[in-house]
Design a protein with these regions (language model features):
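PRPP-dependent phosphoribosyltransferase catalytic core
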Residues: 1-2, 55-120
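A short alpha/beta connector and helix-capping loop motif
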Residues: 43-61
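Internal catalytic-core helix/loop-beta-alpha segment
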Residues: 1-44
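Secondary-structure transition/hinge residues
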Residues: 10-14, 54, 119
Length: 120
């Protein structure tokens, strides 16, 4: 049900579907997954929006890579748990891309297709 609403939001920017999704996620655990967080700015904005508008019971962040300084910045936000696979020292970190063999960008459609296949 939520996957369908996410798909509709992504394709139609439907305010009604966004409101339905917000109600479906209230008091539930939300896991936010990103390909990495260099500065934390996007995740912080997302966390603050979700806390204010979706009111989740728990908010969990999962990242394969994020420098230690960014992880510490994220820890100051209202996040229940942060899971990071690799947290390099700030002075050795250049970009998220340096930790991937292939960092090609994928489309929203590709993400929704993958999620739909794996949720069936």
């Amino acid at each position: 049900k939520c996957m369908t609403k996410l798909f509709n939001i992504g394709n139609k920017s439907s305010l009604k579907n966004a409101n339905d999704l917000r109600n479906d996620l209230k008091n539930k655990s939300i896991i936010v997954v990103d390909d990495g967080s260099a500065t934390g700015s996007t995740l912080i904005a997302a966390v603050r929006y979700m806390r204010k508008n979706m009111m989740p019971k728990r908010l969990i962040i999962a990242l394969p890579i994020s420098p230690k300084g960014t992880i510490n910045k994220l820890k100051s936000e209202d996040i229940n748990h942060i899971e990071v696979i690799t947290g390099p020292q700030d002075n050795s970190f250049v970009s998220i891309e340096q930790y991937y063999r292939n960092f090609d960008q994928i489309t929203d459609r590709q993400v929704f297709d993958i999620m739909e296949r794996n949720l069936k």
